[in-house]
Amino acid sequence: MSESVHTNTSICSKGMLSVIVAQFLSAFGDNALLFATLALLKAQFYPDWSQPVLQMVFVGAYILFAPFVGQIADSFAKGRVMMFANGLKLAGAASICLGVNPFVGYTLVGIGAAAYSPAKYGILGELTTGNKLVKANGLMEASTIAAILLGSVAGGVLADWHVIAALVACTLAYAGAVVANLFIPKLVAARPGQSWQLAAMIRSFFCACVVLWRNGETRFSLVGTGLFWGAGVTLRFLVVLWVPVALGITDNATPTYLNAMVAVGIVVGAGAAAKLVTLETVSRCMPAGILIGVVVAMFSLQHALLPAYALLLLIGILGGFFVVPLNALLQERGKKSVGAGNAIAVQNLGENSTMLLMLGLYSLAVMVGVPAVATGIGFGVLFALAIAALWIWQRRQA
């Protein structure tokens, strides 16, 4: 997009729709690849505790590259950054198809994802602003969750048929995302001319961390989104091990169907948040966050498929309503202080550090033999208490 682009354009503009299509294909590949690679690990007789470790190497890339990816997103046209990042994902998926160690290939996908995230969210603030940004985030989350829904199911179903076919489908999805990125109009770089010295980049990133942490609103958003996504990723792996224990089902498809219900719910919750929550009323989302933990504990006690589907759908609705306003708040406030790209990179550091911690604790619980049901109950209760503490803290800071 040229310099004539102005913010606050329609969320159905050509630029916005191009971003959404590219995001859908990229997220589809991410989620199909996760379940296809988990099936590959199962087929190659890796131990159960290696499953969360697979995700840990992915989020480790986010943490390692966090000081750099925000500046990259703000120093170049964000659509082109997205295209380069999807190219890295394409290379990672293709390498797994060709027999490279799945942990190595998945790490490469993680590097691409780390570079992609600040650009995909930062570009929204360059295409629109204000309360339209909440709606744009809702559209982005809806697209992402639709991709999670379809990608997760496709990955599991195809893997039950043929693991390599599932991996090839992931590679093709990333290739489609690269092509879609070509149709994103070129925006002017948000912050060109920054230093590319390693020490200066690290110093600049941690200065951005300090600026965002000292602001009460952005600190609140960082903690809330970190807890949510850390819990969300852990729940995905918990479901994979919970299904054979609680339901007696051992295929690859059933966990993907159950995880897909969370995705459907997030679409609904994101839509509700776009209509009911503004940047001035973000605290309305907090009760939903507490209820997520309560419902996770209830879900862990189920032994029938139908109530499990219903409760995971409810978890998704609560999750979408909780996280979309927090994302929009950080983007709007962060854009004005440290730049949208840096704000999202700081957010990614927080989210992925939380994911790494939660996945590490979950992997440890699996290694020492804690039952899946007990793990789920404890996980849900702790999450509810954490969000309640965050809400109390935020009210005292106000």
UniProtKB/Swiss-Prot annotation:
Family membership: Belongs to the major facilitator superfamily. LplT (TC 2.A.1.42) family.
GO cellular component terms attached to this protein's record: plasma membrane
UniProt-listed PANTHER family: MACROLIDE-EFFLUX PROTEIN (PTHR43266), MAJOR FACILITATOR SUPERFAMILY (MFS) PROFILE DOMAIN-CONTAINING PROTEIN (PTHR43266:SF2)
Protein name: Lysophospholipid transporter LplT
Subcellular location field: Cell inner membrane
Function: Catalyzes the facilitated diffusion of 2-acyl-glycero-3-phosphoethanolamine (2-acyl-GPE) into the cell.
Single GO MF annotation: lysophospholipid:sodium symporter activity
Broad class of where this protein is predominantly found: membrane
Species of provenance: Salmonella arizonae (strain ATCC BAA-731 / CDC346-86 / RSK2980)
